[in-house]
């Protein structure tokens, strides 16, 4: 089972690919998709879509796991995040991948044992749980790894 974990965002989206082979979890790859806030939103969404599509084609995931988002007090920010999630979900649907959504507190509790863990705690635990993640320093990327990890350990694959 290969999971594509996604920490959705319009400006700095984290993605990660984690596999489960013979009851062993294996980190395959991860990265950040950054868009320029000065670009038109449709160009930013197209860039996210085309970059994630390359990841899907390279790693052939069976499923995508995406973090649920909360409504921000800033309605414009929430709307833009909704656009990014829509573009991501459309791509997931186009490749006929199963998809699971996880609340941030669920991901934190699964990875650290504490549902309100800080970003540095998440990063530390990801590095302990999955070999190959030692060079990850970006919290968006670490969150994507954590989302994929959560999907694999909570869904009994």
UniProtKB/Swiss-Prot annotation:
Q: Cofactor note, please? A: Binds 2 Mg(2+) ion per subunit.
Q: Please state where this protein is localized.
A: Cytoplasm
Q: Which GO terms describe its cellular component?
A: cytoplasm; Holliday junction resolvase complex
> Per its Swiss-Prot or TrEMBL entry, what cofactor is needed?
Mg(2+)
The residues responsible for catalysis, as annotated, are 7, 67, 140
Predominant location category: cytoplasm
Q: Supply one GO molecular-function term.
A: DNA binding
Q: Which reaction does it catalyse?
A: Endonucleolytic cleavage at a junction such as a reciprocal single-stranded crossover between two homologous DNA duplexes (Holliday junction)
InterPro entries hit by this protein: RNaseH-like_sf (IPR012337), RNaseH_sf (IPR036397), X-over_junc_endoDNase_Mg_BS (IPR020563), X-over_junc_endoDNase_RuvC (IPR002176)
Q: Does the record carry DNA repair as a key word?
A: yes
Domain of life assignment: Bacteria
Q: Name one GO biological process term.
A: DNA recombination
Its subunit composition reads:
Homodimer which binds Holliday junction (HJ) DNA. The HJ becomes 2-fold symmetrical on binding to RuvC with unstacked arms; it has a different conformation from HJ DNA in complex with RuvA. In the full resolvosome a probable DNA-RuvA(4)-RuvB(12)-RuvC(2) complex forms which resolves the HJ.
What biological function has been recorded for the protein in this entry? The RuvA-RuvB-RuvC complex processes Holliday junction (HJ) DNA during genetic recombination and DNA repair. Endonuclease that resolves HJ intermediates. Cleaves cruciform DNA by making single-stranded nicks across the HJ at symmetrical positions within the homologous arms, yielding a 5'-phosphate and a 3'-hydroxyl group; requires a central core of homology in the junction. The consensus cleavage sequence is 5'-(A/T)TT(C/G)-3'. Cleavage occurs on the 3'-side of the TT dinucleotide at the point of strand exchange.
Show the NCBIfam families listed in the entry.
ruvC (TIGR00228)
PANTHER family, A to Z: CROSSOVER JUNCTION ENDODEOXYRIBONUCLEASE RUVC
Its name, as the record gives it, is Crossover junction endodeoxyribonuclease RuvC
**Source organism of this protein record:** Rickettsia africae (strain ESF-5)
Tell me the classification of the organism that encodes this protein: Bacteria, Pseudomonadati, Pseudomonadota, Alphaproteobacteria, Rickettsiales
Protein's gene: ruvC
């Amino acid at each position: 089972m290969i999971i594509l974990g996604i920490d959705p965002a319009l400006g700095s989206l984290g993605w990660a690919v984690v596999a489960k082979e013979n009851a062993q979890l294996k980190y395959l790859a991860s990265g950040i998709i950054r868009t320029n806030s000065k670009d038109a939103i449709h160009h930013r969404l197209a860039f996210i879509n085309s970059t994630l599509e390359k990841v899907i084609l390279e790693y052939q995931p069976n499923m995508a796991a995406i973090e649920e988002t909360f409504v921000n007090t800033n309605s414009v920010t929430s709307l833009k995040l909704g656009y990014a999630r829509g573009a991501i979900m459309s791509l997931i649907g186009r490749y006929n991948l199963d998809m699971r959504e996880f609340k941030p507190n669920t991901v934190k509790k699964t990875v650290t044992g504490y549902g309100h863990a800080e970003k540095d705690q998440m990063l530390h635990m990801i590095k302990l749980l999955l070999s190959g993640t030692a060079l990850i320093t970006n919290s968006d990327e670490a969150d994507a790894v954590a989302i994929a990890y959560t999907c694999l350990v909570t869904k009994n694959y």
